[in-house]
């Protein structure tokens, strides 16, 4: 089940105590600091979680070099926090997520956002959807669990297909992507709307890709 050849993003996360210079309720994304990759800082209860990772290319980004720049800018020492290396299974296409009495959810289903590298919301979403479809199946009211795969495709996969297209262009041409996408006054609000589920990538994808390709040419 799931992706036959998963696409992985190599990551390093750092858990920090205190907020540093990060304001209450504020999330920070860095585009261009990591070649063909990402860096972000999410607030937690009593602290901050920082992630650095790379999507494209055989050579991984040097996360320590990135953190040496990012952490002081956030108000922390360059060597602060506990480092943890890992990998994210990035969404890379529509795949069947159910079998005979089996469903895959979260990271096992390769649901991580291919542009923002966010995986918590799809993990929660897939868990809730799995429960919603398993309940009638266990009661004998449903003959299979195919509805789970269909539901995740509609609720998550359709948007991620557009997100993947944006990421493929953006991370290859980050300078152009920054000027035409991230630097725009509406960009922070659009990112927040995508993270919250208020908006999907399909709502903005065609305009963004058209801007990126026209500028590149």
Describe each model-derived feature in a short phrase:
Residues 6, 21, 39, 93, ...:
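Short capping/connector residues at structural and topological boundaries
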Residues 132-217:
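C-terminal helical "tail/cap" subdomain of flavin- and related membrane-associated enzymes
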């Amino acid at each position: 089940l799931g992706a036959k050849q998963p696409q992985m993003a190599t990551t390093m996360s750092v858990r920090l105590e205190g907020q540093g210079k990060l304001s209450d309720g504020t999330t920070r994304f860095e585009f261009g600091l990591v070649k063909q990759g990402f860096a972000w800082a999410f607030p937690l209860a009593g602290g901050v979680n920082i992630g650095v990772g790379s999507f494209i290319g055989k050579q991984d980004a040097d996360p320590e070099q990135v953190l040496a720049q990012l952490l002081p800018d956030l108000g922390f020492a360059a060597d602060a926090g506990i480092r943890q290396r890992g990998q994210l299974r990035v969404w890379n296409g529509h795949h069947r997520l159910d079998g005979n009495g089996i469903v895959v959810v979260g990271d096992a289903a390769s649901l991580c956002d291919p542009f923002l590298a966010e995986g918590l919301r799809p993990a929660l979403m897939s868990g809730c959807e799995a429960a919603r479809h398993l309940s009638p199946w266990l009661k004998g009211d449903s003959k299979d669990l195919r509805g789970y795969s269909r539901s995740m495709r509609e609720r998550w996969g359709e948007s991620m297909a557009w997100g993947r297209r944006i990421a493929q262009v953006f991370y290859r041409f980050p300078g152009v992507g920054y000027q035409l996408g991230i630097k725009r006054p509406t960009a922070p609000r659009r990112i927040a709307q995508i993270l919250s589920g208020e908006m999907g990538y399909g709502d903005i994808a065609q305009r963004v890709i058209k801007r990126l390709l026209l500028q590149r040419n």
